[in-house]
C-alpha cells in the first residue's frame, strides 16, 4: 500500500522541478531506474529474458 501511494505521489508534478524523481511503473522501485527503457534493472532483466524488450539480447563475448 505504501509503495502504491508513493508511485502516485511520484507521478504528480512537484512544486519544484528538482523534487521530481523516476520510479519503475511495474514494481515501484525508486533506485536503479534505466531512463532509456523506463523500468528498473530488475524488471528490465526479467522483461529482456522473456523477450518483452524488442532488440535486447543477453550479451556474450
From Swiss-Prot:
Cofactor dependence: Zn(2+)
GO terms classed as biological process: translation
Superkingdom of this protein's organism: Bacteria
Listed InterPro entries: Ribosomal_uS14, Ribosomal_uS14_bact, Ribosomal_uS14_CS, Ribosomal_uS14_sf
Residues the record lists as binding Zn(2+): 24, 27, 40, 43
SUPFAM superfamilies: Glucocorticoid receptor-like (DNA-binding domain)
GO cellular component: cytoplasm; small ribosomal subunit
Note describing how the cofactor binds: Binds 1 zinc ion per subunit.
Gene3D superfamilies linked to this entry: 30s Ribosomal Protein S14, Chain N (4.10.830.10)
This protein's UniProt keywords: Metal-binding, Ribonucleoprotein, Ribosomal protein, RNA-binding, rRNA-binding, Zinc
PROSITE patterns named among the record's database cross-references: RIBOSOMAL_S14 (PS00527)
A single MF term (Gene Ontology): zinc ion binding
Function: Binds 16S rRNA, required for the assembly of 30S particles and may also be responsible for determining the conformation of the 16S rRNA at the A site.
Family statement drawn from the similarity comment of this UniProt entry: Belongs to the universal ribosomal protein uS14 family. Zinc-binding uS14 subfamily.
Assembly and interaction partners: Part of the 30S ribosomal subunit. Contacts proteins S3 and S10.
Identification of the protein by name: Small ribosomal subunit protein uS14
Lineage of the species this protein comes from: Bacteria, Pseudomonadati, Thermodesulfobacteriota, Desulfovibrionia, Desulfovibrionales
Amino acid at each position: 500500500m505504501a509503495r502504491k501511494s508513493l508511485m502516485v505521489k511520484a507521478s504528480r508534478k512537484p512544486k519544484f522541478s528538482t523534487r521530481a524523481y523516476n520510479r519503475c511503473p511495474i514494481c515501484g522501485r525508486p533506485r536503479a531506474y534505466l531512463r532509456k527503457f523506463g523500468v528498473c534493472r530488475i524488471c528490465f532483466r526479467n522483461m529482456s529474458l522473456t523477450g518483452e524488450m524488442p532488440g535486447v539480447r543477453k550479451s556474450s563475448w
